[in-house]
């Protein structure tokens, strides 16, 4: 809730608001290509990783049985390989760069970190062989802003 009582509820909308009032460092990229790459990877992280992890969690975890009605364990299990397939793609991409969308930290890194952190309660393990994902996640999670 803002000082004037305005409520912003969606995480990307909140991040865009903060970027407008505090533009440095930019979370949504700079220049036409940089902004496009951040949007591309943000959507990939959200739709291919976070959603798969969320479906697994909501349909498998016992604490969610009252929230996800009906809770369909088969659907939760079906989403686990989707998350892992995306992580394999991400691992290949991260072999050539430090951050998800290029040379700078962005909202795509934030979304990816949250998704990977959420894999534990969703009962999805990050495969050991995904060294680039593990390196990237470790670096992102070690940032002071990730501990806030």
Feature map (PLM): residue ranges:
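Alpha-helical packing segments of well-folded alpha/beta enzyme cores
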Residues: 79-86, 136
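Surface-exposed helix-capping loop/turn segments at secondary-structure junctions
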Residues: 92-103, 144-148
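Residue-level signal for nonpolar/aromatic packing positions in well-ordered secondary structure
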Residues: 38, 90, 109, 140-146
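C-terminal end-helix/capping segment
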Residues: 129-147
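Short helix-capping/linker segments at secondary-structure and domain boundaries
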Residues: 61-65, 119-127
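GST superfamily/GST-like fold recognition
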Residues: 53, 100-124, 134, 139-140
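GST-like domain detector, emphasizing the conserved glutathione-binding G-site
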Residues: 1-77, 81, 91, 98
């Amino acid at each position: 809730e803002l000082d004037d009582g305005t409520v912003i509820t969606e995480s990307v909308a909140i991040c865009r608001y903060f970027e407008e009032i505090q533009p440095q460092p930019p979370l949504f990229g700079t220049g036409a290509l940089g902004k496009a790459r951040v949007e591309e990877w943000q959507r990939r992280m959200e739709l291919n990783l976070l959603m798969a992890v969320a479906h697994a969690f909501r349909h498998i975890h016992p604490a969610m049985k009252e929230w996800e009605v009906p809770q369909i364990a088969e659907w939760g299990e079906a989403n686990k390989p989707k998350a892992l397939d995306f992580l394999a793609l991400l691992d290949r991409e991260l072999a050539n760069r430090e951050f998800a969308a290029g040379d700078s930290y962005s909202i795509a890194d934030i979304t990816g970190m949250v998704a990977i952190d959420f894999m534990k309660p969703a009962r999805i393990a990050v495969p050991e062989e995904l060294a680039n994902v593990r390196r990237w996640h470790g670096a992102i999670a070690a940032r002071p802003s990730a501990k806030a």
